[in-house]
């Protein structure tokens, strides 16, 4: 079978660390395994435009492997060219860069799987870290030291504690719930969550979280809001000018879910106006982020409030080990014809939705 693997280039960094599996040089650690079984592996980082390496190989690819960190956007146009495509594997978590509805509604017998759970702890830790970076005003403090400066007042005037704050998560699934667990030791005033379904009673009681069923009511109460929801038709552009106007003035917003959940220009304007005190995360749209993306340079009135990074929260070396192994397990199940996938990994099975996290579920 022909397998197309789309990853980022790591250059010298791949030689520095052999466990940097998620790059073109190290190929998820599966290149020799695939070769030994007689499969053809094409590995590339070139994924944009009709002349890209990805587009060159799509027509006869049996399997495409992609990641959320350097996503191969599997669009309607590309799917129409992919006459042999049987399986798409996301090495990581998040299949929003694949046109799942088009696969489902056109009857294409393509399965889409991801390595569920492979990086939930990694992302949850990053969320809490980003909250601390924003609330404690860490970035400009560190920049002072790098620039050989020392002006405590300039930092302290915009630095706060997490203790005593009301913190809300939009989404309380695998990542969102772990964020709530990790926030408990900080002694927040209250933990809130917004989700389409309530947590089990025992799970709510464990973290002391309260469900708020109206998102405008949720953000109006919160000092800190974190987005931990998948990207789909219902969440794309959810954090826009209108919803931001409902936030408590001077709130902090953290988004490690997907960049397109937020309207980039609206977030930047809210930060610059003071409606938001800070915004941080690691997800952008598109990815890699253009050099002129408004989130690169936005600041609050004190020249702070920006805690953006490249998309790496879910691709720590520990996470890469997990999603590389999970990808291999999915492929092995496919090659042997057992198709005994972990149920939580299946997004589409032969074109039919298995998960409730994505899709319209209205095949015509």
Swiss-Prot record:
Annotated site location: Important for catalytic activity: 258, 311
CDD domains, per the entry: FDH (cd05302)
Result of altering residue 308 to T: In strain: 2.2159
The keyword Hydrolase appears for this protein: no
Residues annotated for substrate binding in this entry: 93, 119
Induction behaviour: Expression is strongly induced by methanol, but is completely repressed in the presence of glucose. However, methanol induced expression is equally strong in cells grown on glucose when formate, methylamine or choline is added. No expression is detected in cells grown on glycerol. When formate, methylamine or choline is added to the culture medium of glycerol- or glucose-grown cells, they exhibit an induction of FDH1 expression.
Binding-site list for NAD(+): 174-175, 195, 230-234, 256, 282, 311-314
Family: Belongs to the D-isomer specific 2-hydroxyacid dehydrogenase family. FDH subfamily.
Protein name: Formate dehydrogenase
């Amino acid at each position: 079978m022909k397998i197309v693997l789309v990853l980022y280039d790591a250059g010298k960094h791949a030689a520095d660390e052999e466990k940097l599996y998620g790059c073109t040089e190290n190929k998820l650690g599966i290149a020799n395994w695939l070769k030994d079984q007689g499969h053809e592996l094409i590995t590339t980082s070139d994924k944009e435009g009709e002349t890209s390496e990805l587009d060159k190989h799509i027509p006869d690819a049996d399997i495409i492997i992609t990641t959320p960190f350097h996503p191969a956007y599997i669009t309607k146009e590309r799917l129409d060219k992919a006459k042999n495509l049987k399986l798409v594997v996301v090495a990581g978590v998040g299949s929003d860069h694949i046109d799942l509805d088009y696969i489902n509604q056109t009857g294409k017998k393509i399965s889409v799987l991801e390595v569920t759970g492979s990086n939930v702890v990694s992302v949850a830790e990053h969320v809490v870290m980003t909250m601390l970076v924003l609330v404690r005003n860490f970035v400009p403090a560190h920049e002072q030291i790098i620039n050989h400066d020392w002006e405590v007042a300039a930092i302290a005037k915009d630095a706060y504690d997490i203790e005593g704050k009301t913190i809300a998560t939009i989404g309380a699934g695998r990542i969102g719930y772990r964020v709530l667990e990790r926030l408990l030791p900080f002694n927040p005033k209250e933990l809130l969550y917004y989700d389409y379904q309530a947590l089990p009673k025992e799970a709510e009681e464990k973290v002391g979280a309260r469900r708020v069923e109206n998102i405008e009511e949720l953000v109006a109460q919160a000092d800190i809001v974190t987005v931990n929801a998948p990207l789909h038709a219902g969440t794309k552009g959810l954090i826009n000018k209108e919803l931001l106007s409902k936030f408590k003035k001077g709130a902090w917003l953290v988004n490690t879910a997907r960049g397109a959940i937020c309207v980039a220009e609206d977030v930047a304007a809210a930060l610059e106006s003071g409606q938001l005190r800070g915004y941080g995360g690691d997800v952008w749209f598109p990815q890699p982020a253009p050099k002129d993306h408004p989130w690169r340079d936005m600041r609050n009135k004190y020249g702070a409030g920006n805690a953006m990074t490249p998309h790496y929260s879910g691709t720590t070396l520990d996470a890469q080990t997990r999603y590389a192994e999970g990808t291999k397990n999915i492929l092995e199940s496919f090659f042997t014809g057992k198709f005994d996938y972990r149920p939580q990994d299946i997004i589409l099975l032969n074109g039919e939705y298995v998960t409730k996290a994505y899709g319209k579920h209205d095949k015509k």
